[in-house]
Amino acid sequence: GLSEQQRHAFLHWVKHFRLANPRQLKRLHNSYNLLRHFYGEDGASAKPADNIGDLVKTLEFPLMITLFALEYLNSLDDPPLRTQLKSSLRGRTKLAFEDEAQPKIRQSLINPAVITLVNRAMPGSQLHLVDAVEPFVLPAIEQNVEAPANVA
């Protein structure tokens, strides 16, 4: 099961990413446990955090946050925004959070702290966190919106 610190972090990041569906939460819990068993314990430092504030400041569980960030992205209804935010998690694009032309990005829950945490390789590996975690996340539903054909 989850340690006390992991439970506190789980609740914090569920609230941060506004994930509330009970089935979704159960799936995320199970996916996180699978990630921990597959890759090993999730990046907890040797010195445990003293309280939830320290835990959040140190962003102690990168697999968990990557899992939740990808879940959040895959739930977005705006495919171009989803693509741009996912690219930022991989460090491929720099988001202009201060740019008035991009209000959707500023309103996104993918903030600079999340990007900084997720844009890294797995410990002891060259595998990017996003690439490591993505197979454990329910994929986004992609819809091709085409103009209806003229029916005569």
Enumerate the predicted regions with their spans.
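The feature marks long, low-complexity, polar/acidic/proline-rich intrinsically disordered regions embedded
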Residues: G1-A152
